[in-house]
Amino acid sequence: LLYEQILRLFPKNRDSIKSLITSLVKQGRIIHDKENDLLCDTAESASNPDYGMIAAFWVLLDFKKAVVYHTNGDFPIKLNFFSKDEWYEILYIPLEQEYLINHVMESQSADQVKRLVVLENEGQARKVTIDNVVAFCLVDTTSGVVSYYTKK
């Protein structure tokens, strides 16, 4: 994740979180790639960041005040979170992977879940046939600004 994402997760404790991050880096428990401003668990993840997870986490941060619990998901779901009585999945669809993700999601139960789908560009939405999509998301991964829209 990006350093700024972790700080935004704990906005009232920014200084404490910065100290904790510094301590974890000194202990070798996490890696801070200062050039890309990434916090990673391994050198391998620092050299090959999961930009889909970074984008999905920006979406999660938009819902932060309402989130009761969150966890990672299984491919192609990046994150799951619960808000009140609602269950959400955040998916990330890279360019040219729309049909693959559609196929994988056909076997996934969609009875009670609401899906937020992060795309690389707006044109991908017309190729997505996943059930229970409540919004498509475009994420500026640098600023964290998320734009939400629905398919017409």
Would you name each region that the model predicts?
Residues G123-K152:
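Domain-level recognition of nuclease-like catalytic cores that cleave nucleotide substrates
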Residues L1-L2, R29-M105:
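Nucleic-acid-binding surface
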Residues D85-Y92, A110-E120, V134-F136:
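Hydrophobic beta-strand segments of well-ordered beta-sheets in folded domains
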Residues P11-K26:
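Short amphipathic alpha-helical interaction segments
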Residues L1-F10:
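Short acidic, hydrophobic short linear motifs in intrinsically disordered regions
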Residues L2, S16, Q124:
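Short phosphate-engaging motifs
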Residues L20, L100-S107, V128-T129:
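A short acidic, amphipathic alpha-helical/loop segment
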